[in-house]
Amino acid sequence: PGRDSFLGSQVHTNDYVDATQYGGKRVLVVGGGTSAVGFLLELEEYASELTWVSRRNVDFLDETELNMEAGTEAVARQDEAARAGRALPSIVSGTGVPRTRRIQAGIDRGLLQPKRMFERIEPHGVRWADGTYRDVDAIVWATGFRPELRHLAPLKLREKEGGIVVAAGSSWRDPRVFFAGYGPQASTIGANRAGRLIARQVIATLSKL
């Protein structure tokens, strides 16, 4: 609530350019994944004040790099949701954030200590449910990406659960429609294999025409 009333700057992950534009500013980073962590580590040198908030607890792993097993399980959950036509869960909710040396150092010096999500945004800052207020000049929304499917409405592919049933990269309702980067392909463990799969499927489909 109040997002439109904020008088400072707001950017999403895809609009973020670099940390230098936040020199001397009080910056709020919103999100609980690796993008939020990366922004905080980069902004630390330039921002006058940094605040990190997340809707959920951030799961810092004991591993120093992404655990392939956890990544595979997260992708499997994406695949299950895509096959059922449900809204897709985030990858990081299943993988957690690896505790690299740089990230551990950020934790040790108090930088990577997320606060709970604020209750509302005000023109010059944010306020929590207990009344605590913090002035903010800029907000970086590192909240991930949602599949943008509205432009596909004329194809009538969406299910009542809110998603599109996708199996092996193609629509269950219309196998001629392929979804590269959707569901289990939107992965932090690498999309090359999925990209090759889609390419082979497209070629096979075209060869039948």
Enumerate the predicted regions with their spans.
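Flavin (primarily FAD) cofactor-binding/catalytic cores of flavoenzymes
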Residues: 1-209
